[in-house]
Amino acid sequence: MTTETGTWTVKKGLAEMLKGGVIMDVTTPEQAKIAEEAGACAVMALERVPADIRAAGGVARMADPTVILRIMDAVTIPVMAKARIGHFVEAQVLESLGIDYIDESEVLTPADDLFHINKNDFKVPFVCGARNLGEALRRIGEGAAMIRTKGEPGTGNVVEAVRHARQVMSEIRKLTTLPKEERMSFAKEIGAPYELVCLVAETGRLPVVNFAAGGIATPADAALMMQLGVDGVFVGSGIFKSGDPIRRAKAIVAATTHYNDPKVIAEVSKDLGEPMVGIEIPTIPAEQRMQERGW
């Protein structure tokens, strides 16, 4: 099998086109159209949103290609889909469908508990989750063109996304102050490629776009993550598990765009109906926390 590969620079550029935007999880063509009309920059095609995956338990796999193709036919914006961690054949299938981006996602049950997908083998850009700088740079070293916080998906609780965003940024700040001779030890300490550690030290940021994901449920949540310094947001269960998905979708897009304007955020937050029911993180057993998946 011959694989056409896109260069990492090209794939990174495709991901940068989504900067400042909102990516919404959708399970039907109708939801995809709502997301597009609300101003989403892309949609994530799924059979079940993370809250339903969490509630159902069992093994969560790649969505049925028919579901993905119907969503792709319904909208003109880019469509993403999820593959299991390490499941390179699911990724090959998604690429063959013509998907725009692949999310190697901890929301699905990992297929490989030792290795992630070698993303350099694919022409389609990959997005991967990270809780810290080491995870982010390992994924980029494997070819990821976009990073997102892991958060804790399907909870409607933004606390873990905040923790992961702050952790990455804190480690970047620390790295930029290190003398050059200490960079190799730092790379060893966090388990990251030395060349990428040096690049981050020189630029003061990740070499790819960094979005927030996992628990974003309100316009204020989205604005919070943007003010913390991320490049955009993923919203999973927070829209279509709420009382008024259309209004909430538009409000989250507006809050992401005008994240530094509390008056706009206040205005779009009015009369949105009930948000999704949230889950306190300490009530989730450690073995059921999706953020722990991957390494």
Curated annotation (Swiss-Prot):
Residue positions binding D-ribose 5-phosphate: 25, 154, 215, 236-237
Class of this enzyme: lyase
Catalytic activity: aldehydo-D-ribose 5-phosphate + D-glyceraldehyde 3-phosphate + L-glutamine = pyridoxal 5'-phosphate + L-glutamate + phosphate + 3 H2O + H(+)
A GO BP annotation: pyridoxine biosynthetic process
Residue ranges the record marks as coiled coil: none
CDD domains in alphabetical order: pdxS
Enzyme Commission (EC) number: 4.3.3.6
Binding residues annotated for D-glyceraldehyde 3-phosphate, in chain numbering: 166
MF terms in GO: pyridoxal 5'-phosphate synthase (glutamine hydrolysing) activity
Functional pathway: Cofactor biosynthesis; pyridoxal 5'-phosphate biosynthesis
Keyword Kinase: no
Record has Magnesium as a keyword: no
Active site annotation, chain numbering: 82 (schiff-base intermediate with d-ribose 5-phosphate)
Subunit structure: In the presence of PdxT, forms a dodecamer of heterodimers.
Function in brief: Catalyzes the formation of pyridoxal 5'-phosphate from ribose 5-phosphate (RBP), glyceraldehyde 3-phosphate (G3P) and ammonia. The ammonia is provided by the PdxT subunit. Can also use ribulose 5-phosphate and dihydroxyacetone phosphate as substrates, resulting from enzyme-catalyzed isomerization of RBP and G3P, respectively.
Family label: Belongs to the PdxS/SNZ family.
Protein name: Pyridoxal 5'-phosphate synthase subunit PdxS
Organism field: Heliobacterium modesticaldum (strain ATCC 51547 / Ice1)
